[in-house]
Amino acid sequence: GRNCDILLNGKDITWQVRRPEVDANVSQVSAYAGVRQAMTVQQRRIGARGRVVMVGRDIGTVVMPDAGLKIYLDASPEERARRRYQELLARGEAADYEEILAGVRRRDQIDSTRDLAPLRPASDAHRINSDGMDAEQVFSVVMNLATQDDPPAS
């Protein structure tokens, strides 16, 4: 389902960036050094504003390596494909589980073997395997970590 709103120049593009054709091409586009560098600059600007939650395959290792709390949220390819499949069906879109699974595996392979910012957890990240967990359970684990690492108010 929909967990957040993604806006571009004030226009809601949440579902557009979740389309299979975007997912199928994001690894190839992000492999360009210029694209990655421009994105990293923008993401760091956002992070410099203060407390922020960022999602991305290189946030903890490249974009925000000094972040106070890093979480490497993972799930098996099968679980991620199942979730995407269910999301597409819930939106009334056609979906093929095997095709989605192949795409997840292909993206993992590309991202984990690329020379520039390969997919890997930061050494100081809290690793969470979310297989079999629903969104509320994952949220609970993350919030527990966030409040443990949160400095007391002065």
Functional labels for PLM-detected ranges:
Residues 1-9, 19:
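Long, charge-dense, solvent-exposed interaction surfaces that engage phosphate-rich ligands
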Residues 7-14, 23, 85-91, 110, ...:
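NTP-dependent small-molecule kinase module
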Residues 10, 39, 53, 104, ...:
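Residue-level signature of catalytic and energy-coupling elements of molecular machines
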Residues 14-93:
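ATP-dependent NMP and nucleoside kinases share a basic, alpha-helical "lid"
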Residues 34, 44, 51-52, 109-116, ...:
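Generic structural signal for secondary-structure transition and capping sites
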Residues 56-58, 62, 101, 117-125:
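Glycine/charge-rich, flexible interdomain linkers and switch-proximal surface loops
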Residues 60, 81, 90, 100-102, ...:
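Canonical AAA+ ATPase core
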Residues 77-85, 97, 101, 105, ...:
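An amphipathic alpha-helix signature
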